[in-house]
Swiss-Prot record:
Its EC number is 4.6.1.17. Belongs to the MoaC family. Homohexamer; trimer of dimers. The keyword Lyase applies. It comes from the Bacteria. Gene3D superfamilies: Molybdopterin cofactor biosynthesis C (MoaC) domain (3.30.70.640). It comes from Vibrio campbellii (strain ATCC BAA-1116). The gene is moaC. GO terms for molecular function: cyclic pyranopterin monophosphate synthase activity; GTP 3',8'-cyclase activity. Pathway: Cofactor biosynthesis; molybdopterin biosynthesis. This is Cyclic pyranopterin monophosphate synthase.
Length: 158
């Protein structure tokens, strides 16, 4: 079994030393979903939501969150991201919004947490903007879709 990289021999949490690692191009994609009532989704899609453009706000929130992941999650390295992209798609037949994020850099550690944070915070932003209309929305299915680069190589979710 693979050992946890953030735990030392004494069981204490520590930030991993990546100084000796080779710099490689790394990319990660993640997704999240927000399930809601058809009426709530229609407010978003039609642009009639009283708080403004929900997708634009969620996109910016996701991008900002990726850049601040190191500040939110203990032991994450501050990274010089070269790309953060957040796409939002209304899936009206299923009454949900799909969020997909992509983070990329040339560096010594991966960007999986940044991609997951971007998708998660974009979903939270949708909830925040729509909670006055509907409080029982469900955020879920947050997952890593794919990652490339680094020692562990390529991963793609099934």
């Amino acid at each position: 079994m693979t050992q946890f990289t953030h735990i030392n021999a004494s069981g204490e949490a520590n930030m991993v030393d990546v100084s000796a690692k080779a710099e490689t191009v790394r990319e990660a994609r993640a997704e999240a979903f927000v399930h809601m009532a058809p009426e709530t989704l229609q407010l978003i899609v039609s642009g009639q939501h009283h708080k403004g453009d929900v997708f634009a706000t969620a996109r910016i929130a996701g991008i900002q969150a990726a850049k601040k992941t190191w500040d939110l999650i203990p032991l994450c390295h501050p990274l010089l991201l070269s790309k953060v992209e957040v796409q939002l798609e209304a899936i009206e037949a299923e009454n949900k919004v799909r969020i997909e994020s992509v983070c990329k850099l040339a560096g010594k550690t991966g960007v999986e947490m940044e991609a997951l944070t971007a998708a998660s915070v974009a979903a939270l932003t949708i909830y925040d903007m729509c909670k006055a209309v509907q409080k029982d929305m469900v955020i879920g299915q947050v997952r890593l879709l794919e990652k490339t680069g680094g020692k562990s190589g390529h991963f793609k979710a099934e």
